[in-house]
Swiss-Prot record:
Disulfide bonds: none annotated. GO terms for biological process: translation. Residues 139-161 are annotated as: Disordered. It comes from Baumannia cicadellinicola subsp. Homalodisca coagulata. Belongs to the universal ribosomal protein uL3 family. The gene is rplC. Part of the 50S ribosomal subunit. Forms a cluster with proteins L14 and L19. This is Large ribosomal subunit protein uL3. One of the primary rRNA binding proteins, it binds directly near the 3'-end of the 23S rRNA, where it nucleates assembly of the 50S subunit. One of its GO terms (molecular function) is rRNA binding. It holds the Pfam family Ribosomal_L3. The modification N5-methylglutamine is found at residue 151. Keywords: Methylation, Ribonucleoprotein, Ribosomal protein, RNA-binding, rRNA-binding. Residues 139-153 have a biased composition (Polar residues). Methylated by PrmB.
Length: 212
């Protein structure tokens, strides 16, 4: 198995026996139900597809309803896929994956969607230095400045840092410590901050690059 889907609840802190404050993010990991198993023969690669949570019946479109019915499960919030390098131990449709998977894992990689900040200037978006506040400067305090040269090359280079939509992007944070696991309440307590607003879905995987 490669990972699970969870939902960000929010942040708080806990104290160690020595009185040290640790900032933590609380993630609710409801049971993940396998809805499809893919193989080289049928799909060209190995993977398993999961769903979690619930969705109002009036929001489930017919293709989704048929897919969930074929898997013998209720409609979940969405569908996620975890690709496998090779065929692992048998995974069955309808099988339930729980937080117990992480009981012997100390570090995880978590992927989420960062908070959207709307259209932002270069000072906020890229941490550009502001121009002079006075000394003849007028109306150009937060202006980007030059974005290129002249006739040669006669263009703005691709990737130039400029104003634009900030946030609302897929972000992965690696090597996050697992502080505590509550199997009874399906809660995963992670040290530090995680991208996204409370309520966002998160992809949780065992750390691929363990730090020493």
């Amino acid at each position: 198995m490669k990972g699970l889907i969870g939902r960000k609840i929010g942040m708080t802190r806990i104290f160690t026996d020595e009185g040290i404050s640790i900032p933590i993010t609380i993630i609710q990991v409801e049971p993940n139900i396998i809805t499809q198993v893919k193989s080289i023969q049928t799909d060209g690669y190995y993977a398993y597809q999961v769903t979690t949570g619930t969705k109002k019946p009036n929001l489930v479109i017919k293709p989704e309803a048929g897919h969930f019915a074929k898997a013998g499960t209720k409609a979940g919030r969405s569908l996620w896929e975890f690709r496998l390098k090779h065929e692992e131990k048998p995974i069955n449709i309808g099988e339930i994956l729980t937080l117990e998977y992480f009981t012997n894992i100390k570090k995880v990689d978590i992927t989420g969607t960062s908070k959207g900040k709307g259209f932002s200037g270069t000072v906020k978006r890229w941490n550009f230095h502001m121009q002079d506040a006075s000394h003849g400067n007028s109306l150009s305090h937060r202006v980007t400045g030059s974005i290129g040269q002249n006739q040669t090359p006669g263009k703005v280079f691709k990737g130039k840092k400029m104003a634009g939509h900030m946030g609302n992007k897929r972000v992965t944070i690696q090597n996050l410590d697992i502080i505590r696991i509550d199997l009874r309440k399906n809660l995963l307590l992670i040290k530090g901050a995680i991208p996204g607003a409370p309520g966002n879905d998160l992809i949780i995987k065992p750390a691929i690059k363990l730090s020493h």
